[in-house]
Curated annotation (Swiss-Prot):
Gene3D superfamilies per UniProt: 6.10.250.2860, GTPase HflX, N-terminal domain (3.40.50.11060), P-loop containing nucleotide triphosphate hydrolases (3.40.50.300)
Species the sequence originates in: Nitrosopumilus maritimus (strain SCM1)
Stated name of the protein: GTPase HflX
Keywords, ordered alphabetically: Cytoplasm, GTP-binding, Magnesium, Metal-binding, Nucleotide-binding
Localization per record: Cytoplasm
UniProt-listed Pfam families: GTP-bdg_M (PF16360), GTP-bdg_N (PF13167), MMR_HSR1 (PF01926)
Co-factor(s): Mg(2+)
């Protein structure tokens, strides 16, 4: 595993997530520098911190330096020139993870589109640096003229988009076929590493790769299950993360758009998180689902890892998420299978009602934890 120095914000949840991203990308964090501000003009950090970083970098000699914020090309170049190391900002790090995780032809195309969008946003500045005789440390472009460079990126983006459009049309045909056959559909959604794939495996009897690492799932997998003796199709989808830029969501649109067409979305929530992390992740999930046009009345909330908490802790967190009056949540354990049967029954009852607004069954801690 390659070594990395991590520069991140001085907040525990942010540090943990940044380290998780590094681990998922195959980097072992050997030193962490925590700062209140990471958006200073020249380096992102102050000159004093840069001097300290130079000393540490010379001593540790890491393979990369990970900067947990979005860097301008000039900032990336300035850091690389001062530290003589490859610099990865937050978005580049996520793209590294995506590239290593992509297994299907479609997910590889989606990652390529996201990479090209990342490159396009930085094209002008990189051309300017190149014309000045300065060579950025990451994605260097040599002496390309700006129009040649732009046209090259646009051409590659159009090629990838064309292939993704074909995949999207094929996906639409599959959706229409499932609808004609009368299949109801369920999709799992939620923050990355919340336990979606583990729950998917428990509900379907599958043995998909599951991990506590971030972004284990990049491509959609669909399987058939029976609920109340009726056939359903259930899909696992890519996880969300805070500060995921719009262009990355757009790149995975053909995969994520499944959420807009499914009958029920199971929003998987890691109820074992601290209240601060829980609120942040839940807010991020709901914002992303809203951007994808997913209606709240089609959502069911699976409060995963509930076997690790006392009833009172779960109730407190349900109040924190403003789900007390919502009738469509249930504490589960994807690992032990606890209440997974009840989750299926809840989904069946909702779909049988044909109108989620009229759904009246109350599911709560008292009703489910005794089973």
């Amino acid at each position: 595993m390659k070594s990395a120095i991590l520069i991140t914000y001085d907040k525990e949840d942010v540090i943990n997530e940044a380290k998780g991203l590094c681990d998922a990308a195959g980097f072992q964090v050997v030193h962490t520098i925590k700062q209140k501000f990471l958006k200073r003009p020249k380096y992102g950090i102050s000159g004093g911190i840069l001097e300290r970083l130079e000393e540490i970098s010379e001593k540790i000699r890491p393979d990369v330096i990970v900067f947990d914020e979005v860097l301008k090309p000039s900032q990336n170049y300035n850091l690389a020139a001062a530290l003589h190391r490859e610099i990865l900002d937050r978005e580049a790090l996520i793209l590294e993870i995506f590239e290593s995780r992509a297994s299907s032809a479609e997910s590889k195309l989606q990652v390529k589109l996201a990479q090209l969008r990342y490159e396009m946003a930085r094209a002008k500045e990189k051309v300017r640096l190149s014309s000045m005789g300065e060579q950025p440390g990451f994605m260097g472009i040599g002496k390309f003229e700006v129009d040649v460079y732009y046209n090259d990126i646009k051409h590659r983006m159009n090629t990838v988009r064309s292939k993704l459009e074909k995949a999207g049309k094929q996906r639409e045909l599959h959706r229409q076929g499932r609808k004609r056959m009368g299949f109801k559909t369920i999709s799992l959604a939620g923050y990355t590493s919340a336990g979606k794939t583990t729950l998917f495996n428990m509900m379907t009897g599958e043995t998909r790769d599951q991990s506590s690492e971030l972004f284990t799932t990049l491509s959609t997998t669909t399987r058939r299950v029976s609920i109340n003796q009726e056939p359903f199709l259930i899909s696992d989808t890519v996880g969300f993360i805070s500060k995921l830029p719009a262009y990355m969501i757009d790149a995975f649109k053909s995969t994520l758009e499944e959420l807009g067409h499914t009958d029920i979305i199971i929003v998987v929530i890691d109820i074992g998180d601290s209240i601060f992390e829980l609120k942040k992740k839940f807010s991020s999930c709901m914002r992303t689902l809203s951007e994808l046009g997913v209606e709240k009345d089609r959502m069911v909330y699976a409060l995963n890892k509930s076997d690790l908490l006392e009833h009172s802790e779960i109730e407190e967190k349900i109040e924190t998420l403003n789900l007390v009056d919502n009738k469509k949540w249930i504490p589960v354990s994807a690992k032990t299978g606890k209440n997974v049967k009840q989750l299926k029954e809840l989904i069946g009852d909702i779909l049988e009602s044909h109108n989620s607004h009229k759904f009246g069954k109350k599911i709560g801690v008292e009703e489910t934890f005794g089973n």
